[in-house]
């Protein structure tokens, strides 16, 4: 399993940042590893909504269907994608502050089957992938990365 967690402080109000993050169609705007994202089930974000997210992969792009499995409006949600080869669990939490909010993005990626043997390599690559996504998120939220102890 590979895990990446980041904390981004933003001047945006918490409800605005949450709405932006909860609409998974925005992933392609800030995550350079995502080429397309479309909602396939539900009417807007919320528990049970599903999104097809196309990610860069070798040898060809991979479409992952993310379902929102946990939802606490304006606070936190979890989106899960599962296939025969992997499981991705992304939890986004938004905490308000006087000067905006902190967005915490916690991503876990688990390879399945024979691909699980590549877990050590995945851990190394996932850090670099996460750093690029964090840079895009900082730009999208007009924010800055903050240490884990200061969300």
Question: Which residues fall in each region the model found?
Answer:
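Hydrophobic ligand-binding cavity/cleft-lining segments
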Residues: 1-41, 150-151
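Intrinsic-disorder/low-complexity, polar/charged segments enriched in Ser/Thr/Lys/Arg/Asp/Glu/Gln
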Residues: 1-7, 15, 50, 63, ...
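Hydrophobic/aromatic beta-strand elements that line small-molecule binding cavities or substrate pockets
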Residues: 6-8, 39, 64-70, 81, ...
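Amphipathic alpha-helical segments that line or abut small-molecule/effector binding pockets
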Residues: 15-18, 131, 135
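Glycine-rich portal/gate segments that line the openings of hydrophobic small-molecule binding cavities
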Residues: 38-85, 102, 132-151
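Beta-strand/loop substructures that line and gate deep hydrophobic ligand-binding cavities in soluble
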Residues: 80-132, 149
């Amino acid at each position: 399993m590979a895990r990446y967690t980041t904390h981004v402080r933003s001047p945006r109000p918490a409800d605005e940042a949450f709405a932006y993050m909860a609409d998974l169609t925005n992933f392609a705007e800030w995550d350079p590893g995502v080429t397309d994202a479309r909602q396939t089930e539900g009417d807007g974000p919320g528990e049970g909504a599903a999104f097809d997210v196309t990610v860069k992969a070798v040898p060809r792009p991979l479409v992952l269907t993310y379902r929102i499995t946990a939802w606490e409006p304006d606070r936190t949600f979890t989106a899960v994608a599962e296939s025969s080869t992997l499981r991705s669990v992304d939890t986004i939490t938004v905490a308000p502050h006087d000067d905006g909010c902190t967005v915490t993005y916690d991503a876990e990626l688990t390879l399945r089957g024979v691909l699980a043997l590549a877990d050590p390599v995945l851990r190394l690559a996932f850090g670099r992938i996460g750093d690029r996504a964090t840079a895009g998120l900082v730009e999208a939220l007009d924010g800055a990365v903050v240490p884990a102890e200061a969300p």
